[in-house]
């Protein structure tokens, strides 16, 4: 029994070391891939949320706004993937994330069933899931050390 407990503790410690060494980098890369992918779909005019974006930000021509939003998202994604200028990247990330919630304010009929904020539509679920992306941004941002150079070895390794 003692051997099993010791083996379990060693495995547990190894797993924790692995997650500490790679978790933030993996989160940054995964978030970067999502942003590049979603942005590329908008630029190509193939995004399934293009109409939603156009209908939410109705005061700007969607032929201009949707591709520009896509370029913005690609830039955020590339920044996350590279780990360069993370403070600026995260600023753009936060601005984009704030924009995703506009539909809840400007077009609530698209997000909520029968006007009830507890009853989400598919669109509402799509928007609310961005809370997970926000949490990911918080974790990535929490790893940036105050005053650290933007492109240090720590930033590239995911521990900045």
Language-model segments: which ranges?
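Membrane-interface extramembranous regions
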Residues: 1-160
């Amino acid at each position: 029994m003692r051997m099993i407990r010791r083996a379990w503790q060693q495995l547990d410690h190894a797993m924790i070391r692995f997650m500490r060494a790679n978790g933030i980098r993996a989160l940054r890369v995964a978030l970067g891939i999502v942003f590049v992918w979603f942005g590329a779909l908008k630029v190509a005019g193939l995004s399934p949320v293009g109409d939603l974006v156009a209908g939410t930000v109705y005061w700007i021509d969607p032929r201009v706004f949707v591709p520009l939003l896509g370029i913005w998202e690609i830039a955020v994604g590339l920044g996350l993937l590279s780990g360069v200028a993370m403070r600026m990247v995260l600023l753009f990330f936060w601005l984009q994330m704030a924009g995703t919630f506009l539909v809840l304010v400007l077009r609530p009929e698209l997000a909520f069933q029968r006007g009830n904020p507890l009853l989400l539509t598919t669109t509402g679920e799509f928007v609310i899931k961005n809370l997970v992306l926000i949490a990911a941004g918080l974790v990535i941002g929490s790893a940036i050390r105050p005053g650290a150079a933007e492109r240090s070895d720590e930033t590239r390794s995911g521990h900045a």
